[in-house]
């Protein structure tokens, strides 16, 4: 995992969509997986996976929000840590020392990596292919993690490959009422936030501030067109492998 010291940043983009209203927030220190969770890692913890595009080194996909959360809990237990999630209520205990999904603010903070531009490498998408697997270069499928350049903080595939589930419920107007310190999304909602774009995304949908949402589909298996969704884990600061 990569340690991110936390800090203040401007979340959103004045040139983006209406739900990207710029506002300054701060996040506490946390650790984030350097790579998206791979099929091999997922199988090691869960025992099997339902990815469409079989490749042990590629990110696990066809994964629901609930399945990602259950993986976080199982990974925590496997390492002797306290699970963050109550799978009856789907509430996250942010004080627990186990693995969880990043908040939307944590995800954007990590993706920006100290930058203020549309992407961590600048405002132009001309260099996106050096950092991401997207519609133009993926060959129509997700690719092995870590094969493109990392962002300035050493995180790989923050753009493209698989779109990443975040912990937050989605609300188009949330930025207008979001707290300035450690925002964790609305208390309820029908969809969860997904960030970063995927192997099937246009460049504009991979921007650091771009927001997307999806029905969390509370089931272990996603049947259909969910081979663009995956995830990576975070832990609140206090020690991580």
Regions found by a protein language model. Name each.
Residues 1-51, 56-76, 159-160, 167:
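A short glycine-rich, aromatic-capped structural motif
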Residues 2-3, 31-36, 61-62, 100-102, ...:
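Structural recognition of the beta-strand scaffold that forms the well-ordered cores
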Residues 9, 55-129, 165:
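Short, well-ordered surface patches within globular domains
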Residues 14, 37, 48-49, 76, ...:
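Acidic glycine-/aspartate-rich tracts in secreted/extracellular proteins
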Residues 89-94, 100, 132-159, 186-188, ...:
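Short, well-ordered junction/capping motifs at the entry into regular secondary structure
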Residues 149-151, 184-241:
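Disulfide-stabilized, aromatic/cysteine-rich ligand-recognition loop
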Residues 172-178:
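A short, polar/charged loop-to-alpha-helix boundary motif
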């Amino acid at each position: 995992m990569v340690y991110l010291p936390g800090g203040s940043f401007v979340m959103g983009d004045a040139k983006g969509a209406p739900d990207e209203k710029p506002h300054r927030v701060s996040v506490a220190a946390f650790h984030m997986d350097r790579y998206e969770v791979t099929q091999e890692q997922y199988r090691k913890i869960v025992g099997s996976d339902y990815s469409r595009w079989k490749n042990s080194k590629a990110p696990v996909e066809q994964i629901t929000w609930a399945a990602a959360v259950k993986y976080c809990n199982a990974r925590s237990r496997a390492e002797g840590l306290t699970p963050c999630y109550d799978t009856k209520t789907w509430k996250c205990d942010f004080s627990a020392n186990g693995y969880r999904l990043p908040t939307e603010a944590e995800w954007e903070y990590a993706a920006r990596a100290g930058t203020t531009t549309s992407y961590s490498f600048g405002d132009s998408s001309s260099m996106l292919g050096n950092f991401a697997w997207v519609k133009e270069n993926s060959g129509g499928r997700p690719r092995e993690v870590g094969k493109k350049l990392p962002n300035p903080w050493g995180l790989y595939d923050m753009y493209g490959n698989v779109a990443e589930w975040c912990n937050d419920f989605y609300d188009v107007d949330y930025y207008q009422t979001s707290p300035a310190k450690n925002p964790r999304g609305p208390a309820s909602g029908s969809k969860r936030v997904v960030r970063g774009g995927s192997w099937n995304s246009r460049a504009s949908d991979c921007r650091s501030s771009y927001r997307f949402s999806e029905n969390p589909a509370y089931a272990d298996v996603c049947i259909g067109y969910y081979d663009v969704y995956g995830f990576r884990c975070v832990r609140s600061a206090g020690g991580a492998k």
